[in-house]
Design a protein with these regions (language model features):
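Membrane-embedded, lumen/periplasm-facing catalytic core of multi-pass transferases
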Residues: 124, 468-582
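Hydrophobic, aromatic-rich transmembrane alpha-helices
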Residues: 3, 19, 177-189, 359-398
Length: 669
């Protein structure tokens, strides 16, 4: 991380990590954010060349063209006319020590152990493997991972995997946090003058339970975070921008890329667009500024094009651009006409949705996905309360008011859309900024008033309470991140901890103290293999490289995969990557394509096309009976046949998963 020291504490915006529109210069991450943005844009551009698939040559041409487009767009979005002239560049050792080193240390705590997180096994991995080479649904496929969101972020991780390896690819999460941290620093510098304290505040703001839980995993939830924070910063400073038209295009492009990376960011994009429109109205009234029509068209293109190709592709396939969601509006014949939602998470009624931003802290298991052993310290809820408070206070800075309004608007949209905390990282960052602002405000009041002033006592009490509360939240979040675990499924469901490390020995005592259960068992012997697993770093780009001749022989007869249960499509893509995958599985308990007569007709036709070829499914041993019963939920035209025990290495010779290779027998006509 290379930084430039500020000569003053003036606000400055950051676009692709560069200082912009500020003659004082600013401290920001320069090359890192450009690399991340280039990776995002290149992968999105690659979607527009999905037609070039079917061979190494076409794929190389497609990626070359995408890279050229990516470089051109990033060059345009970066600041090419910075009028600041710093005396020189130097490394900010304080930033490295307080922010970078702790985040890297946290990442390296689990890094050697390959992450086999459920969503990755279920659809992210297989979607990435296909989308990197062409259409995400190949000839002979039917939704191989069951769910197909925009694969752009999966492609980003896929590129990182082929560059760095499977274990180090999640370093992208650390990069996103460092970029976000550099932007947070710019928000804080107007009211936290001391660099060391400001950097510590940045670390505290970044340390939330959902962020620390996924920083080591190939999850894509953090990719859009710096883009959203950048957009907010640019919107707030739009009246002072040197080139407002160009800034407007940047904002729209960042929001468009955010939507392409994560559909759930729409709950933040809508409030940010509303704030942008308000700012444009204020500027037009006060400064008589009106964007040029050509630049408005470019801004619209930046907002729409990153997702347009994929939405059009899904509409062509299914009749619903957001398939399978919002099907009560689009009525795709491939699934029931309903708006599907996670039934065990988030608010359960419209009334509960209204107060979910406050009450959800009392039921953390409904805030988190796929677990009943979570706790939450309430950063988001505190932020909502403080946002209301600062709007009622006198002399609150305009920027803080705008942050507060954005937080309140987006938090209620989030509650109505899902209410799941992993989709609220941007809101948690804004909550952290408000926490630091309120603390600095109370501290200044407490130290500036005369000793006999009654307000001094009140503010001193407020400082003490805020100190205790923020210390508790940071400590709880940090401990959550250190002791959190994902289940591994080596021999049976949740038979151990996926990425074991020494702090996991304290997981069970911590959960017992909170009267919460723990599913997995901590194995110190597996944790002790840290350096053995670390030896595979930079050598784990290709999963097939870990398969022995015996492993390959287990799957040599597979011509077609039938995905019959959640969480196995990645194993299929590793075991026999060239075989098409036809999914007939339910997606958890959320939606089921097979309830549609049209889907059953399509799937039966595809299976009949492969009649005479060997078809198989892969299952975790614990899931065999559930999968067999699930096949009987509707008539599908096939049943389970011969069952064989197999073992598959997953990015590690020692990290094997025991599976059942089940032959699929097509029913007689």
């Amino acid at each position: 991380m290379t930084h430039r020291e500020p000569e003053s504490e003036a606000y400055s915006t950051s676009v692709s990590g560069r200082a912009e529109a500020n003659s004082s210069g600013s401290r920001s991450a320069y090359s890192l954010s450009d690399v991340l943005l280039l990776l995002y844009v290149t992968c999105i551009a690659r979607e527009y060349f999905w037609l070039l698939n079917g061979g190494w040559t076409k794929n190389a041409i497609a990626w070359s063209l995408s890279s050229v487009i990516g470089v051109a767009i990033v060059y345009f979005l970066a600041d090419r006319c910075d009028d600041s002239k710093p005396d020189g560049w130097k490394i900010d050792w304080l930033w490295l020590a307080i922010v970078v080193l702790p985040l890297l240390s946290f990442f390296l705590l689990r890094a050697p152990f390959p992450s086999l997180e459920f969503d990755n096994l279920n659809y992210h991995f297989v979607n990435a493997e296909r989308a990197l080479r062409g259409w995400p649904i190949r000839a002979g496929d039917f939704f191989p991972g069951t769910l197909l969101p925009n694969p752009a972020p999966d492609m980003v991780l896929g590129v990182a995997r082929y560059l760095l390896g499977y274990r180090l690819a999640p370093l992208l999460n650390v990069g996103c946090l460092l970029w976000t941290g550099a932007l947070i620093d710019q928000f804080l510098r107007t009211f936290v003058r001391t660099r060391a304290l400001r950097y510590l505040a940045v670390l505290v703001i970044l340390s939330t339970e959902p962020i620390l839980a996924i920083v080591n995993t190939p999850m894509i939830d953090l990719f859009a975070l710096p883009l959203l924070v950048s957009s907010l910063l640019l919107i707030i400073k739009l009246p002072e921008a040197r080139n407002r038209d160009r800034t407007l295009i940047k904002i729209a492009s960042f929001l468009g890329i955010s939507l392409a990376l994560k559909l759930t960011t729409v709950v933040f994009i809508v409030p940010l667009i509303a704030l942008l429109l308000y700012q444009l109205r204020v500027i037009s009234m006060r400064l008589k500024y009106y964007p040029a029509r050509s630049n408005l068209l470019l801004a619209a293109a930046g907002l729409i094009l990153p997702s347009a190709l994929f939405f059009g592709y899904m509409y062509h396939l299914t009749g619903n651009p957001f398939f399978p969601f919002y099907n009560n509006i689009f009525h795709s014949p491939l699934i029931a006409a309903a708006n599907f939602k996670e039934i065990t998470m988030g608010p359960r009624s419209v009334l509960e949705t209204l107060y979910w931003p406050f009450s959800s802290v009392l039921d953390p298991n409904r805030l988190f996905i796929s677990t009943n052993d979570s706790w939450y310290a309430g950063r988001l809820q505190l932020g909502v309360v403080l946002a209301i408070a600062v709007l009622l206070m006198k002399n609150t800075p305009v920027a803080i008011k705008q942050i507060s309004i954005t937080l309140l608007f987006s938090t209620w949209l989030w509650a109505f859309s899902s209410g799941i905390i992993r989709y609220a990282n941007f809101a948690e960052i804004l909550s952290g900024i408000l926490c630091v602002y309120m603390f600095s405000y109370a501290y200044r009041k407490a130290t500036s008033l005369a000793p006999w002033h009654i307000e001094k006592l009140k503010t001193q009490v407020a400082v003490v309470l805020l100190t205790l509360l923020l210390t508790f939240q940071f400590s709880a979040s940090l401990w959550y991140g250190l002791t959190y675990y994902y289940c591994s499924n080596g021999t049976h469901l949740c038979d151990g901890i996926m990425q074991p490390q020494p702090f996991n020995r304290y997981t069970r005592p911590t959960l017992q103290a909170l009267n919460l259960p723990m599913k997995a068992v901590y194995d110190p012997n597996k944790a002790a293999t840290y350096f053995q697993e670390a030896a595979f770093m930079f050598r784990d780009r290709n999963a097939q490289a870990f398969l022995t001749t015996k492993d390959r022989e287990q799957f040599q007869d597979v011509k077609v995969w039938i995905n019959t249960y959640d969480g196995t499509s990645a194993f299929m893509a590793i075991a026999a990557p060239d075989a098409p995958i036809i999914s007939v599985a339910k997606f958890l308990d959320i939606f089921d394509y097979m309830t549609s007569p049209e889907t059953r007709r399509i799937v039966r036709g595809m299976i009949n096309d492969h009649r005479g070829e060997k078809m198989y499914t892969l299952l975790l041993i614990d899931h065999f009976e559930q999968a067999r019963l699930a096949l009987n939920r509707v008539p599908m035209g096939f049943h389970f046949g011969k069952v064989q025990n197999v073992s598959l290495p997953v990015f590690s010779a020692a990290n094997r998963t025991d599976l059942l290779l089940v032959e699929i027998v097509v029913d007689e006509r």
